[in-house]
Amino acid sequence: MFVLNELPPQIPRELTELLVKAEPATIGHFLDYGFMDPEIRSLLPDKRIAGTAVTCRFSGVDGTIMHYALGQIRPGDILVVDRGGDRRHAACGGGVCFAARAAGALGIIIDGPATDIGEIREYGLPVWSRGLSAVTSKRLFTQGEFCVPVSCGGVTVTPGDAIVADENGILVLKKDQIEAVAKRAITMQQDEKPRLARVAKGERLPDINGTNAKIREIMAKK
């Protein structure tokens, strides 16, 4: 059975351009939720993307819906794939990644394996997956869901959510969270540079960030 829904509105470009400047690892200093399982890892180094989540879900071997998604996805979209717990069949390989890149997709995030790592590297489309598998999905035309709420890496992803992802992790945000979260992270990243400069000159980090002073205060109360 197929479930085919309409594409969601895209996140405005000014928000994704802001969000891509924010490192997920910086956001993780003040936000605990919305991060996918760290076992879903980037297959390409030094890549960060931020865009609109477009989702699909299929279980087992029938990956027909992946090919359907390639005809729907827009520039600036990130395809998020719920594999229903399947860890054996690769959801995408070189051909799908090449087609996704040609359609303008920013990347693919799979709660399951991918394949054709050499071609993925050659084509340069950022892909996150739970490793690799030589056993692939097939087009059997039996089932698949497009643009439905999915679970990926333990996080519910609704079509139209914002995604920011790099080799440190993947974060899902609602549109109304983007500006505040991104600006806070960017400020933290900017503040770190002068702090590291002080460390380079000989100061100790726990003196700069107040850790030593706070511990002395706590110990003095004993």
For the regions a protein language model found, what residue spans apply to each?
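Feature captures the catalytic cores and cofactor-binding loops of soluble hydro-lyases/lyases
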Residues: 1-159, 173-222
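C-terminal binding/interaction regions
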Residues: 163
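Beta-strand-loop-alpha-helix segment that lines the small-molecule cofactor/substrate pocket
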Residues: 166
